[in-house]
Every structure is written in C-alpha cells, then in structure tokens.
Amino acid sequence: MLEKGEHIEYPNTPPLHSPPESHTFSSQTDDSYFHKPSSTGLFATLVADTNSSVPSASRSPESIASSQSNDSAAIPSYRRKRRKVRKPEIVKPTLRKRGRKPKNISTLEHDKSKPVISSLIDEDANLSQIKARKSVLESRFSRLEEAFRDFYIKNLEKTEDLIRTDSHFVLNKELLSFRNDYEHRRKHYEKYSQCLNKQLDHFFSYKVTTVHKSYQRFATLLRRHLLDKTAKRYHDLCEKRPYKYITTDLLSPSLTCFASDILQTVPEYTSSQSSPVLLPATPSIVTNKQMMDDLTLCNV
C-alpha cells in the first residue's frame, strides 16, 4: 500500500517515430521525448510530429505552413470554425404613396403643362416661321402618304399575281388544310349516313314484319270470332225450324274447314208429305261486307 504523499513514477514512453536505439526506458525526464500537444484536434495530439526534435526557431516557414495545413486538414469539416459572412441587407422596394389632392384646386392653375401644339412652337415665333414649319410638315406627310401608297399597291399587285398563278404560300396552305378537313368530314358523314340507313332499314323491316305478323294473327282471330258468332246466330235461327238429325255441330271450331259442304240435307219427318229443309253452310272466306254485316248483327 502506498502511504500518503507517495506516487508511482512510470517510465517515459519514447516517441512513435524515434530511432530504435533510443527505445530505452529510464526514469529520467527528457524534454526531447515529449511533444507539446496541439490544440487543433485529437489526431494531432495523439500522433507526434516527425520534426518535433527540431526547434521551432530553426524550422523553415514552408515546413511551418505545411504542418499548419496538415493540422487544418486533420480537422473534420463539421468541427471547423466557419467564417461569419455578413449577409447583404435586402433592399425593400419603396412604396409610392399617392399624393393627396390639394383642398384648394386653384393651386393647380399655375402647374398646368403646356399643350402639345403650343410646346412645339416657340412663343417668340413669327407668323412666317409658323407657315414655313407648316409647309415642311405638309411635305413630309405627303411624302409618307405616297410611300405608303406605293408600298401597299406593290404588295397588292404581288399578292394578286401570286393568287392568279396559284402560288401564294399562305393561301395554298390554308386551302390545303381546308380541303383535307372537308374530305375528312365528308368521308365521316358518308360512313355515318350509311350506318344510319342500315339501322333504319333494319328497324323498318323488323317493324314491318312484326306489324304484318300481328295483323295476320289479329285477322285470323277476328275471322274465327266472327265465324263463331255467325255460327251461333245460325244455330239460334235454325233451332226454330222443324229438323232433326243434324250431322254437323255448328258451334264446333271446325266450321272453317267444311267449305266443300255447300248444302246440308235434313232427313224427312215421319210424314211422307213434308219436304227436306236446306240449311246454308258457314262460309270459309268472309268478305269485308259480310264481316261488317256480321259485326253489326252480333253487336261485336
């Protein structure tokens, strides 16, 4: 155990880049073995400089600058002190304030600007100078007018020649685009009209066939109904006559099929003096007049 006031002395470690013969452990303190730690970073404090044994006075400025650059390069970028750059002040645009209208409008009478025509002419100009100025301006305007007229006439003549020879670039381009658009629209409408005509034909043919079938069915049902009504009427009329043994049932649905039987004979009575009764048969084909008569008769 150590007593108070005593401390352990460790041998001084040699520098990292010292020659091998100097690796001797001694308890004596030697300033050449120590390297003053640099405050620039951890790497510079741990790694000894190769030129530590050389005094600073005898070192060249190039070596000092290189060592300082190495020390600064050893510092990581996020630890370096950045120089503060003064930001330029943002110049704000000045707002133009509208001037207040003066309460007294009479103050503006002296600030009125001169009119344009009067500003072009001096106040001290004579009448002859004004007339000369007027003549100069008139001649200039006449020359400008002639130049513009010649320019537009030449352009119009050139344009007319180009149109006449069918070589006007802009008009030909417009005509070509118009023709292409017209042809495209015409083909489109032709296809559309053909498709529409097909749909209409199909629709009308379907409707015609449907109506025709419905009419045929309705006509058949009406004819059968009228025949049944007329047969019933005939039966009611024939019940009042003295006949027997009728072989055909007048109310049967087969009335439309016995058109070959034009007349039906009824057998004689027990009396030999009576004559046979002739009954009209139900027709298989009904005319329009007979149909209307039957409808009126049967109250259908």
From Swiss-Prot:
Record localization: Nucleus
Ranges for region Disordered: 1-38, 50-109
Keyword annotations: Meiosis, Nucleus
Protein's UniProt keywords contain Nucleus: yes
Keyword Nucleus part of the UniProt annotation: yes
Signal sequence segment: none
Ranges annotated as biased composition (Polar residues): 21-38
Feature: compositional bias, Basic residues: 94-103
Listed Low complexity bias regions: 52-69
GO cellular component assignments: chromatin; nucleus
Biological process per Gene Ontology, one example term: meiotic cell cycle
Role according to the record: Has a role in meiosis.
Protein name (record): Meiotically up-regulated gene 165 protein
Lineage of the organism: Eukaryota, Fungi, Dikarya, Ascomycota, Taphrinomycotina
Encoding gene per record: mug165
